[in-house]
């Protein structure tokens, strides 16, 4: 199996886990954790050439770059059922700020300074420590139009990218 195929396979599994967790109403931090991981692995798989003998870089900053690359790929645009390149570019551009927020859910971005779905944090030494299971992550509300749009795109990309 190639690095590309392995990352795409794992991305699909991570997303299926996110969907299963969502159906069981487990704490939202776990859904967000799997969202961040599946989007990162999709990006790494997509950006890694099939012939690569080296794994992708060990970075969490891959999803936004992946979307930017996809924006210029006519075959991806067509598979996502967009006939107009400008409309597709606008669609992707409209998601980039939110995709950046999802990408920044990785604890390495948040460090001890802010909310992430994996590790407890506190903003200042005077603040209490917060566990992710007790935080509601309001910017990622599942009813948020950007969240819905991003989840739809992720689902579609996981189906079409090989």
Question: For the regions a protein language model found, what residue spans apply to each?
Answer:
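Long, charged low-complexity segments
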Residues: 1, 47, 51-162
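Charged alpha-helical initiation segments
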Residues: 1-37, 45-59
